[in-house]
Amino acid sequence: MLLVNEKDLVVPGQVLAENEYFPGRGTFKEDNRICSSFVGLVSVRNKKINVIPLQSKYIPKRGDVVIGEITDIRFSMWGLDINSPYTGLLPASEVFGKDKRELESVFDIVDVLLLRVVDVDEVKKVKLGLKGRGLGKFRDGILVYITPTKVPRLIGKRGSMINMVKEKTHCDIVVGQNGVVWIKGEPDMERIAEKVVLMIDREAHTSGLTDRVRELLDRLTGVEPEIQVEESEGTEKPETPESEDFEEASDYSEDVEVSPESEDIEEVSDESEDLEVESEDVEEGTDTPAAEEDDGEAGDAEVKDENNSER
């Protein structure tokens, strides 16, 4: 018997279900009862109960796409902070070069990279790689850190939430599965985007978040609420600003657990020789032309009317 509802906020030791249900992430079984291990939100999938913690550290998984900052240059590899208890390692073989001097000429300390987790061994040694579309070095921008389990809420269903933030601030935004968010735009818009991202992180477990985010964005960017009015003669429509660097959003899972596939993170650019990330322009889709109406039936009707009149 299920004793809680989907997305209920629970505390450690709280009984979630009995008998026919199975324990999942963030839970433990005691006798025939399934209990929560964390303060978090309930997620039920096929009789399996999970608790998604409100606060957690990023645990690397093979295939994850993450944002990391170089903190150390070692012999034949770079060490990176990936917002995790475990340090990420980028071998020189994943880029090029053999000695420390060559490594520094490619990436230096405090450089920020978009990488893929290649492997995680039994002692949590995290090997990173740059082979893949869109992976490489970021130029400028700011970093914002959020709880990794709240990444799907920031992204939203089919990228709806993150797209709204990008459209209203005209910023390029890339979200790593490790809870690191890269933002680049005009300085004032970067600060607005940062404030909104942190708000989503704080209030991810609450209802009505999308409407509150939209209202905050409109207020901070100075956009008035849309009001339906009749246009008078001589009134010019304001031009809609277009962002040349607007990036195409990928589809994201609504579930809290992020799939490790590359489609679960926004692409930044095609892989270039200097491994630097650049924004891509989004090609506007053309509208599908409407099908032409068949005039055959109308023609037949006219012939019948003429025959009737002759009679």
Swiss-Prot record:
Residues 63-131 form the S1 motif domain. Non-catalytic component of the exosome, which is a complex involved in RNA degradation. Increases the RNA binding and the efficiency of RNA degradation. Confers strong poly(A) specificity to the exosome. The keyword GTP-binding does not apply. PANTHER family: EXOSOME COMPLEX COMPONENT RRP4 (PTHR21321:SF4), PNAS-3 RELATED (PTHR21321). This is Exosome complex component Rrp4. GO terms for biological process: CUT catabolic process; exonucleolytic trimming to generate mature 3'-end of 5.8S rRNA from tricistronic rRNA transcript (SSU-rRNA, 5.8S rRNA, LSU-rRNA); poly(A)-dependent snoRNA 3'-end processing; RNA catabolic process; U4 snRNA 3'-end processing. Residues 139-197 form the KH domain. Its main location: cytoplasm. The lineage of its organism: Archaea, Methanobacteriati, Methanobacteriota, Methanomada group, Methanobacteria. SUPFAM superfamilies: Eukaryotic type KH-domain (KH-domain type I), Nucleic acid-binding proteins, Ribosomal L27 protein-like. Residues 222-311 are annotated as: Disordered. GO terms for molecular function: poly(A) binding. It is found in: Cytoplasm.
